[in-house]
């Protein structure tokens, strides 16, 4: 039997038209963006996999109802960490994997991260501050999994571990 994989992703902002302009996303409209994000997610994640979603799932009217409908379409067991636009989810979670300690949190500048000695996996900054918050930042021990940085699909924790072991800055997943 194959192992469950662990994936991470943040800041999908489903249904949020302005995010396309604001973050320079390569979509012409919300429908295209939503469809692509769902397709990318389901091409990567299988039903038994775990996805840590690090906040800001959806922005729309009837958000709770729309979020439930959306989640029906996405593969995997999804664990929610609350983003600044969310009303649900844990504030953060600490996990251990392959000998590393990771704090999963939406905003890396949160006071919860202050005395944490492991790696911080976060979203929130999108691709707007890549010098400070690239995909992999060994100096800060931070990992940015905002969708713009990871090419609009969930990224595996196995890949993240491989990259942090190399000890190099990786601006976006497209630089690999």
From Swiss-Prot:
Q: List the Gene3D superfamilies.
A: 3.60.21.10
- Record Pfam families: Metallophos
CDD domains under this entry? MPP_AQ1575 (cd07390)
Q: One MF term from GO for this chain?
A: hydrolase activity
Q: What's this protein's name?
A: Uncharacterized protein MJ1445
């Amino acid at each position: 039997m194959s192992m469950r994989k662990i994936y991470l992703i943040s800041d999908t902002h489903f249904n949020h038209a302005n995010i396309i302009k604001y973050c320079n996303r390569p979509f012409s409209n919300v429908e295209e963006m939503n469809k692509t994000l769902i397709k990318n997610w389901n091409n990567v994640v299988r039903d038994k996999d775990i996805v840590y979603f690090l906040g800001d799932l959806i922005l729309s009217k009837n958000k709770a109802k729309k979020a439930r409908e959306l989640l029906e379409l996405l593969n995997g067991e999804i664990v929610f960490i609350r983003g600044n636009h969310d009303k649900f989810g844990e504030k953060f979670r600490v996990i251990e994997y392959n000998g590393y300690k990771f704090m999963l949190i939406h905003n890396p500048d949160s006071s919860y991260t202050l005395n944490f000695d492991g790696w911080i996996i976060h979203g929130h900054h999108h691709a707007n501050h890549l010098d400070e918050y690239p995909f992999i930042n060994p100096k800060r021990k931070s990992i940015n999994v905002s969708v713009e940085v990871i090419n609009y699909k969930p990224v595996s924790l196995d890949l993240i571990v491989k990259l942090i072991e190399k000890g190099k800055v990786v601006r976006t997943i497209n630089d690999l």
